[in-house]
């Protein structure tokens, strides 16, 4: 299957009432499990390399891994840079084969966010690469607060940047270990009304209950980022493997026991968005 772009997998969601998952990758084992899950569900998938992943594994290595998985998959696979800090990391990702980049200027003023996002979007478009941006800070369950997305700013932001997708702050939080995020559905409706046709993204998808994901997928929310649920599945499987035989030490044998549980968790995430 040819590597897919962000536009190719998100645009159909606006009309068919579904969403695509952006799954946070930390290594080969989970990336492979995510693709197998997508193939089993016959759905597209977005493989995401966030700051933590990039601190552990260089982008050229991640790019090669994502490209290999995409080119050998039977479903569309998007290689996505998550939370790019500046235009330089976005350009490096493109040079490494990524088909989608996110520039996160949410902590900046509106004017600076528009200006820098526009620069990234202009650069990425010249390579046929999709761009996600963020308007309004999405906070963390264990720290930084959210600022919320102002619906009154959305139309101008989209008009002036031309991004392919917009991450919004509506009560969602990164790193929630259980569902229950206080999602402001009225604000989502206001944002969608301000920019009809713009695919919206919710980071912190693990904090959003599966039934609510299904409901939100029938709006303009076309992408849910999910990581914590999958890391929890990986950690539980690895602990169980070690506890069964504390003397085990073979890395490949141990990690192989995480693949089925992570695949199952990824399949559940994919099913929750349609």
What feature does the model see in each segment?
Residues 209-274:
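C-terminal alpha-helical cap/extension of soluble enzyme domains
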Residues 4-16, 26-52, 60-74, 84-196, ...:
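Alpha/beta enzyme core
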Residues 56:
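Cofactor-binding active-site loop characterized by glycine-rich and histidine/acidic residues
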Residues 80, 132-134, 201, 269:
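Generic enzyme active-site microenvironment
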Residues 136, 205, 229:
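An acidic- and aromatic-residue-enriched active-site/binding cleft used to recognize and process polar
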Residues 1:
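Conserved oxyanion/phosphate-binding beta-strand-loop segments in alpha/beta enzyme cores
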Residues 23-25, 79-84, 199-207, 212, ...:
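Histidine-centered catalytic micro-motifs
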